[in-house]
């Protein structure tokens, strides 16, 4: 086997990291203060479980952290892991929210998945967890 063939058979760095998809968090630096964090992920992709066609969405995450805060590179790589996943819009939004809640235990969290129109249909799925506190 040539070195080129050996390299081709090994997953690329990005593919390995995406496959791991670990949501890493760090301690909230100000747990006594209510505040909100807004994260936008404009390049979410998954596959339609019915047609196999790609679906594209902007994910908008707004949350009030509890004991832990989500690390940004980790959430990017986690979201990228959905690229080849056959999943409905509704299940994608709910599963992502569930995984984020387990990882960081927020006081309150809302995820909006704004999917690009396909076939003249525009879908926005909004899911939430917990009770929003005044900041």
Swiss-Prot record:
Q: Which GO terms describe its molecular function?
A: preQ1 synthase activity
Annotated positions binding substrate? 70-72, 89-90
Query: What are the record keywords, sorted?
Result: Cytoplasm, NADP, Oxidoreductase, Queuosine biosynthesis
Which GO biological-process labels does this protein carry? queuosine biosynthetic process; tRNA modification
- Protein location: Cytoplasm
Relate the protein's function as given in its record. Catalyzes the NADPH-dependent reduction of 7-cyano-7-deazaguanine (preQ0) to 7-aminomethyl-7-deazaguanine (preQ1).
Q: Where is the active site?
A: 48, 55
Q: Cross-referenced Pfam families, in alphabetical order?
A: QueF (PF14489)
- Family matches, as InterPro entries: GTP-CH-I_C/QueF, NADPH_dep_7-cyano-7-deazaG_red, QueF, QueF_type1
EC no.?
Answer: 1.7.1.13
Q: Does the keyword Hydrolase apply?
A: no
In which pathway does this enzyme or protein participate? Answer: tRNA modification; tRNA-queuosine biosynthesis
The gene name reads: queF
- The scientific name of the source species is Prochlorococcus marinus (strain MIT 9303)
Name of the molecule in the record? NADPH-dependent 7-cyano-7-deazaguanine reductase
Q: Which SUPFAM superfamilies match?
A: Tetrahydrobiopterin biosynthesis enzymes-like (SSF55620)
Stretches assigned to coiled coil: none
* Gene3D superfamilies cross-referenced by the UniProt entry: 3.30.1130.10
